[in-house]
């Protein structure tokens, strides 16, 4: 039974939520840091860490799994090429969330998520 296994809904249906998480994770890995809401940053932190862990593994199965999640095939190649020397000694915690000022229109808490 999956009692108390809650998924942050982010105010969207499941298919839109999955697409949003994939898009934000792809952009985070491409640019290194993005600004988004705090709730979205907390959700994509785990997905970005999972992609970097797959890149550190470097196997063909891990590469195929990452290319099925990320939208950009060239990004998969660059992440897998740079992950071993950048995060080789680190055992997790590849991202950092910095809280910023609230958004002006609706006062939602904003954050900057960046790769360490």
Curated annotation (Swiss-Prot):
GO biological process, one term: translation
Assigned keywords, A-Z: Ribonucleoprotein, Ribosomal protein
InterPro entries for this protein: Ribosomal_bL17 (IPR000456), Ribosomal_bL17_CS (IPR047859), Ribosomal_bL17_sf (IPR036373)
SUPFAM superfamilies linked: Prokaryotic ribosomal protein L17
Organism taxonomic ancestry: Bacteria, Bacillati, Cyanobacteriota, Cyanophyceae, Gloeobacterales
Gene source species: Gloeobacter violaceus (strain ATCC 29082 / PCC 7421)
PROSITE patterns recorded: RIBOSOMAL_L17
Designated name of the protein: Large ribosomal subunit protein bL17
Family classification: Belongs to the bacterial ribosomal protein bL17 family.
Cellular component, GO, one term: cytosolic large ribosomal subunit
GO MF annotation list: structural constituent of ribosome
A Pfam family hit: Ribosomal_L17
Assembly: Part of the 50S ribosomal subunit. Contacts protein L32.
